[in-house]
């Protein structure tokens, strides 16, 4: 794993969480780089960090937030709004998220599969550059977790954690 792989690490966890939610009837899209949304409302977030010693990962940390029964801010949604009450217990979803982390550990060995599955779950097909306001078509996700963009003959990529790119979000 390279330093620029922190973004792919986060997407791997987001994908595993999305799969876990889907297995319980909740369809969540991946809002690059680190959120899960239902419609346009945020259900969960992922904060990845890889700690390196030289070129080797020494420690992988992941922060996971999932709205289950809690009050949510405007623009958010909780599982209690999506599932019957008996299926919205915090301890139950703690277990489901631990299972998602185990699944992410398995997925990490297959970055091409992660990218393909994450691309199918992307929240939109075009984005506006926050700095310029220009609209870009989303072409996919790079093996380092970058969001790949095209505007006519121009291409760029956005990265959120580590690595190098033409543009940043």
Regions picked out by a protein language model, each given a short descriptive name:
Residues 1-169:
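Catalytic beta-strand/loop module used to bind and position nucleotide/cofactor moieties
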């Amino acid at each position: 794993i390279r330093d620029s792989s922190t973004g792919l690490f986060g997407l791997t966890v987001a994908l595993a969480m999305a799969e876990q939610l889907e297995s319980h009837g909740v369809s969540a899209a991946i809002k690059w780089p680190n959120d899960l949304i239902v419609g346009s409302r945020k259900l969960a977030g992922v904060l990845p960090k890889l700690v390196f010693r030289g070129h080797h990962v020494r420690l992988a940390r992941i922060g996971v937030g999932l709205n289950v029964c809690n009050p949510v801010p405007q623009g958010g949604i909780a599982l209690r709004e999506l599932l019957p009450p008996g299926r919205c217990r915090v301890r139950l979803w703690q277990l489901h998220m631990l299972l998602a982390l185990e699944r992410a550990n398995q997925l990490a060995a297959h970055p091409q599969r992660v990218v393909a599955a994450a691309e199918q779950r992307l929240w939109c097909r075009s984005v506006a550059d926050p700095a310029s306001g220009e609209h870009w078509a989303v072409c996919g996700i790079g093996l380092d977790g970058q969001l790949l963009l095209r505007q006519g003959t121009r291409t760029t990529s956005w990265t959120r954690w580590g690595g190098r790119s033409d543009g940043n979000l």
